[in-house]
Amino acid sequence: MVTERQQDILNLIIDIFTKTHEPVGSKALQESINSSSATIRNDMAELEKQGLLEKAHTSSGRMPSVAGFQYYVKHSLDFDRLAENEVYEIVKAFDQEFFKLEDILQEAANLLTDLSGCTVVALDVEPSRQRLTAFDIVVLGQHTALAVFTLDESRTVTSQFLIPRNFLQEDLLKLKSIIQERFLGHTVLDIHYKIRTEIPQIIQRYFTTTDNVIDLFEHIFKEMFNENIVMAGKVNLLNFANLAAYQFFDQPQKVALEIREGLREDQMQNVRVADGQESCLADLAVISSKFLIPYRGVGILAIIGPVNLDYQQLINQINVVNRVLTMKLTDFYRYLSSNHYEVH
């Protein structure tokens, strides 16, 4: 059982330690804790017994343990604070013209990396929730073509493919027609089911030879299931993570899955501190936060760093970036949905 004073002591030690990275002694706490040095030392000893503090080898001071950081995140972190003094600099960073969604997400990731010194990941709306709003096939050569998908009227995905040997030019038109008639307006998840249920029967009616047609459907739609992910500050991992964690970030789709699984459907923010799960990020801290992508859904920003982070400062920063990012995205999508020649 941690008393109120002990919690204040733990919070103060974490605050000092994350700024100085030096063990904290009782004298450093006396100005802020209205108790004698002996009382503070006794409370520090009790926190150490509970595993929330640990002794430094070269000093009489104490520093937070992993369990101490976990306790702090669970009991003391304020998710609703907004660092007003940082708003101006963040707004200024977004005060430029962006030409695609990925550039806006990259700016947010770069900004958080610069502020935190950590690695940052930004995720678009979950692929399965996005809707196919336009489709076309562009013939590139005698034997190659490009499938062009537009998702949510804003994101373009392409898939290059070899035209099957048994395909005539009219077969490409049939393929395009089926996709436009059956899939437009549907979510990627719906399309996934349709390819496995409706399409096998439909191609029997449309194609004289059905060899490779289902395989072609699977191939050209495969890219739509990939996460739209941007990263920044990967090299920072070398300062606080092992080689396995660094190499893990060479697999962006696995990184996206790890980040997404760390945030429940009903959570807007979460902080994981060395949660011990079987993961390359198990010994690290992950601060993740959802942000609104107007007209489309929610994305996720995640900061990955060492356990001894200044959590309150990072929560403040990610809150500000979230709000400014949503404002920028609102403007971006309002422009996309308007008549170009009426926008000034």
From Swiss-Prot:
Entry's Gene Ontology BP terms? negative regulation of DNA-templated transcription
Say which domain of life the source belongs to.
Answer: Bacteria
Q: What is the lineage of its organism?
A: Bacteria, Bacillati, Bacillota, Bacilli, Lactobacillales
* One term of GO molecular function: DNA binding
Q: What is this protein called?
A: Heat-inducible transcription repressor HrcA
Check the record and name the PANTHER family matching this protein.
Answer: HEAT-INDUCIBLE TRANSCRIPTION REPRESSOR HRCA
Q: Which HAMAP family match?
A: HrcA
Gene3D superfamilies xref list = 3.30.450.40, Heat-inducible transcription repressor hrca homolog, domain 3 (3.30.390.60), Winged helix-like DNA-binding domain superfamily/Winged helix DNA-binding domain (1.10.10.10)
> Keyword Repressor on this protein?
yes
Gene giving rise to this polypeptide: hrcA
Please list every transmembrane segment annotated in the UniProt record, as residue ranges. none
Q: Does the keyword Flavoprotein apply?
A: no
The family database entries (NCBIfam families) matched by this protein are listed as: hrcA
Entry keywords, A to Z = Repressor, Stress response, Transcription, Transcription regulation
